[in-house]
Design a protein with these regions (language model features):
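N-terminal regions immediately upstream of nucleotidyltransferase
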Residues: 1-38, 87-95
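Active-site nucleotide-donor binding segment shared across nucleotidyl transfer reactions
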Residues: 44-75, 79-87
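Short aromatic-enriched loop/helix-cap "lid" or pocket-rim segments at secondary-structure transitions
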Residues: 67-68, 91, 176
Length: 223
């Protein structure tokens, strides 16, 4: 059973309302954080491919390390390329530019096929009892959208959770981090256990974001 399962909607509504009031947050933020935490626990502890995922990105900085205060709505995941039969360092073998592009395209096609034909199917089978629905984002074959049962009308947040999943990033350095929903900051005894999530080291995440910012700032002027 999921570590963050709450039996009834009425109980969950009370927990979210009171936590939001005490933390001076909107109910929709606390509600979405609850379902993000729920999904993370499932992916890293109950899903059949749990050992092949690593959590990364801005949401990991706020959720796992409390290093940024911005509420991040998406779940970014690295999928271990060894799941598809590649060797540890196969993506880094010396290739021509066209050869590397071909390799990257082949790997990405394997990921999107896996997500569409296997991963989404298992998500819907495993989590249908919690009224969660999953499908491939029609605008991005590397993303899975999750519709969760809304107890509060969203005002500014996207009312789906997006799982962004790629295979081209290295899954190290990583560490195992314990998380709970925001609700536990007000009700520490509601969830008896933490969920342990394998997460990319925050120094690497900051470094990657710095490189992205550098590349954007140094992009040639098209004019």
């Amino acid at each position: 059973m999921n570590k963050f399962y709450v039996k009834t909607d009425s109980e969950l509504r009370i927990l979210i309302t009171n936590a939001a009031t005490k933390m001076k947050l909107s109910e929709e933020v606390v509600e979405k954080d609850y379902w993000i935490s729920f999904l993370l626990d499932y992916i890293f502890n109950q899903n059949r491919w749990s050992n092949s995922f690593t959590f990364k990105g801005g949401t990991s900085l706020s959720k796992c390390f409390n290093l940024i205060k911005r509420f991040s709505e998406d779940i970014d995941l690295i999928l271990d390329w060894r799941l598809f039969g590649y060797q540890d360092d196969e993506p880094y073998i010396q290739r021509s530019k066209s050869g590397q592009n071909k390799f990257n395209l082949e790997m990405n096609e394997k990921v999107t096929t896996f997500l569409k034909d296997e991963f989404v199917k298992v998500l819907n089978e495993d989590l249908k009892e919690f009224n969660l629905e999953f499908w491939i984002d029609p605008n991005d074959p590397n993303s899975v959208l999750c519709k969760y049962p809304l107890l509060f009308e969203p005002n500014y947040l996207f009312n789906k959770i997006k799982l962004e999943i790629g295979c081209l990033g290295k899954w190290t350095p990583a560490e195992h981090v314990k998380i709970k929903p925001l609700i536990s900051q007000v009700y520490p005894d509601v969830f008896k256990e933490y969920s342990t999530i394998r997460t990319i080291n925050p120094e690497r995440t900051f470094w990657e974001k710095a490189l992205i910012l550098h590349s954007v700032c140094n992009k040639p002027d098209e004019n």
